[in-house]
Structures are given as structure tokens and as C-alpha cells.
């Protein structure tokens, strides 16, 4: 989660293009899929090559004794804790710009991959034979923070202030939300319900107790058929 100032530009209306039927491109029956796979492979190869020149993939060289490859909000934490470090900020993480990453890795003495959750960038970088430090010290769990960097890289034991002793406030649907009425009826009927990701997932908790499954957006339909 993050926030920051936003500068709005003039609205640009998209070009109204007529629909053109193209089953060879859009209907992935086996014969078409085999042909289209060549286009996908070519596109990915060009993206990987051209990605090294994209402005959204930016190498910031400062102190080359330490370097970070990162993306998204973790970049802000790196800049906060290591303002003088060299940083490769990736705006496009798939496919990764191999040439740019290799050049960056050669110019820094110690390389860290600072990415939240799964080691997507890290595993690819290591597969290219580039030495780096990632999930050996950084967790796969939850959101990262500047304090995590201080603790794992600098060895600083950062003391955090305890939360004030406030009464617990469990998540609930907003007052007036129409989902409340829907779930109340479903609860009275004792119906099993398959849900999607969204605020209405709160229908699973008391006092509504309706939603039985939630996997991802759109999964409720196929899950319901399975139930």
C-alpha cells in the first residue's frame, strides 16, 4: 500500500477501431495455437532485448560497493535506507531485461534482490549465473518495509513502538452495503455459497457466515459447478 502526489494530463480518448474477425489469431484450437506460439516466442524475445532500453527499467549508479535490483514499492524502501547505493529499478519484470541486469551486476560488488513474496526476479537472475542475495535473508511473507532492510542488511535491531491499546475492530461490510441483505437471506436459507475476491468475501465471517470458498476473481462459477 502506498500513496503519493499525482499529476494529471489532458484526457486522451482512445481511437474507436472497428472489430475485425480473425479466428486464426483469436481461436486457440490446436492448429492455430501451434502457429501463434511462434508469434508469442518472437514477441517475448523482442521484449527481453528491447527492455534494456525501456525508460521504465532504470539503472541508478552511485556507490557500487552495494547494489539492489527491485521493483514497485520496495524501491522506495531501498532509497530510504540506502540513498547512496546503486539501484536497478525494474518497471517491467516479465520478461526481464537480461542485458541490462547483466551489465548492472558486473558493476556492483554485492548484489541484493529485494522483492516481496516469491523470488520471481531472483530465480531468473540466478539461472543466468549471476551471484546475488535474496530470499536467503528476506522473507517470502507479507509486505516489506525499510526496517526489514535495516535489520537484514545492516544488522540493526530496529525497535518499533507498540500499537496503542485500542479495542479490536473486526472487518465488516460497510453500513448500508446491499451485500448485507443478500447474505442475510442466504444465511436464513442455509445455502452454500462460492465467492470471488472482493469486499463481499466478508460474507464468510460472523454474523453472516455464508461464503464457503474464495480462490480468485471469477472462480466462484466453476467452483460452484464442482460443489
Feature roles, as predicted:
Residues 1-173, 178-182, 187-191:
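Flexible, low-complexity linker and terminal segments
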Residues 183, 192-227:
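Thiamine diphosphate
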Amino acid at each position: 500500500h502506498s500513496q503519493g502526489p499525482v499529476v494529471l494530463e489532458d484526457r486522451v480518448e482512445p481511437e474507436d477501431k472497428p472489430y475485425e474477425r480473425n479466428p486464426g489469431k483469436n481461436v486457440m484450437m490446436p492448429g492455430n495455437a501451434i502457429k501463434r506460439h511462434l508469434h508469442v516466442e518472437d514477441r517475448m524475445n523482442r521484449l527481453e532485448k528491447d527492455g534494456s532500453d525501456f525508460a521504465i527499467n532504470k539503472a541508478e549508479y552511485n556507490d557500487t560497493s552495494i547494489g539492489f535490483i527491485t521493483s514497485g514499492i520496495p524501491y522506495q524502501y531501498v532509497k530510504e535506507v540506502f540513498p547512496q547505493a546503486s539501484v536497478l529499478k525494474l518497471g517491467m519484470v516479465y520478461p526481464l531485461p537480461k542485458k541490462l541486469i547483466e551489465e548492472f551486476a558486473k558493476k556492483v560488488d554485492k548484489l541484493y534482490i529485494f522483492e516481496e513474496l516469491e523470488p520471481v526476479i531472483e530465480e531468473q537472475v540466478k539461472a543466468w549465473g549471476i551471484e546475488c542475495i535474496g530470499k536467503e535473508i528476506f522473507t517470502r511473507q507479507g509486505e516489506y518495509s525499510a526496517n526489514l532492510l535495516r535489520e537484514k542488511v545492516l544488522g540493526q535491531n530496529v525497535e518499533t513502538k507498540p500499537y496503542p491499546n485500542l479495542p479490536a475492530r473486526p472487518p465488516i461490510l460497510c453500513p448500508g452495503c446491499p451485500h448485507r441483505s443478500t447474505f442475510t437471506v442466504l444465511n436464513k436459507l442455509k445455502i452454500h455459497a462460492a465467492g470471488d475476491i472482493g469486499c463481499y468475501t466478508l460474507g464468510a465471517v460472523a454474523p453472516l457466515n455464508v461464503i464457503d470458498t474464495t480462490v480468485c476473481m471469477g472462480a466462484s462459477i466453476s467452483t460452484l459447478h464442482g460443489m
